[in-house]
Amino acid sequence: MKSRHKKLALIGGALAIIGIIAALVLNALNSNIALYISPTDVAEGKAPQGKAFRIGGLVKEGSLQRQADGVTIAFVVTDTAKDMTVHYKGILPDLFKEGKGVVAQGKMAADGTFTASEVLAKHDENYMPPEAAKAVGDAQAKSAGAEKPKASY
């Protein structure tokens, strides 16, 4: 082989290796992405089937139910427009309370409930997870817009 052909082969091999590494990294990142979906979006059928996503809002007052085993919990997440039942098996964060902000990551179950693999609670009195705050604000805006008749000129 000539020197020129060796250089071209080396450059081609390096580009192929870089391409394979880039494809593997993008595949790993794509599989770890969890979209945020509000309870209203889930009710409208916008939740991905068979893929993990995050759902957020407020824990509905009086909805927390603990099973006899002590680690299985069911609660309702609301964005003030729609509600979604969440099932979680594990220890809840210390700051988890009814009426407070929460974001849960998991998948939709066959029965239409959300099975969470992770539950995140708010940090302090003034904090609500950004996704939950946006969902609550959007839901309130939708319900306010639906209640008010639109002006015609």
From Swiss-Prot:
Compartment annotation: Cell inner membrane
Q: Which GO terms describe its molecular function?
A: heme binding; metal ion binding
Which Pfam families would you find in this protein's record? CcmE
Residues in compartment: Cytoplasmic: 1-7
Q: Which UniProt keywords apply?
A: Cell inner membrane, Cell membrane, Cytochrome c-type biogenesis, Heme, Iron, Membrane, Metal-binding, Signal-anchor, Transmembrane, Transmembrane helix
Which regions face the Periplasmic side of the membrane?
29-153
Q: Which GO terms describe its biological process?
A: cytochrome complex assembly
GO cellular component terms listed in the entry, alphabetical order: plasma membrane
List the InterPro entries: CcmE (IPR004329), CcmE-like_sf (IPR036127), NA-bd_OB-fold (IPR012340)
The topology of this chain with respect to the membrane is: Single-pass type II membrane protein
Q: Where is this region: Disordered?
A: 130-153
Task: Please indicate if the UniProt record lists rRNA-binding as a keyword.
Answer: no
Q: What is its main location?
A: membrane
**Where does the source fall among the domains of life?**
Bacteria
The reply on keyword Cell inner membrane is yes
Q: Which positions are annotated as binding heme?
A: 123, 127
TM spans (from-to)? 8-28
Q: Which PANTHER family match?
A: CYTOCHROME C-TYPE BIOGENESIS PROTEIN CCME HOMOLOG, MITOCHONDRIAL
Q: What does this protein do?
A: Heme chaperone required for the biogenesis of c-type cytochromes. Transiently binds heme delivered by CcmC and transfers the heme to apo-cytochromes in a process facilitated by CcmF and CcmH.
Protein family membership: Belongs to the CcmE/CycJ family.
User: How is this protein named in the record?
Assistant: Cytochrome c-type biogenesis protein CcmE
Organism (species): Dechloromonas aromatica (strain RCB)
**Encoding gene (name):** ccmE
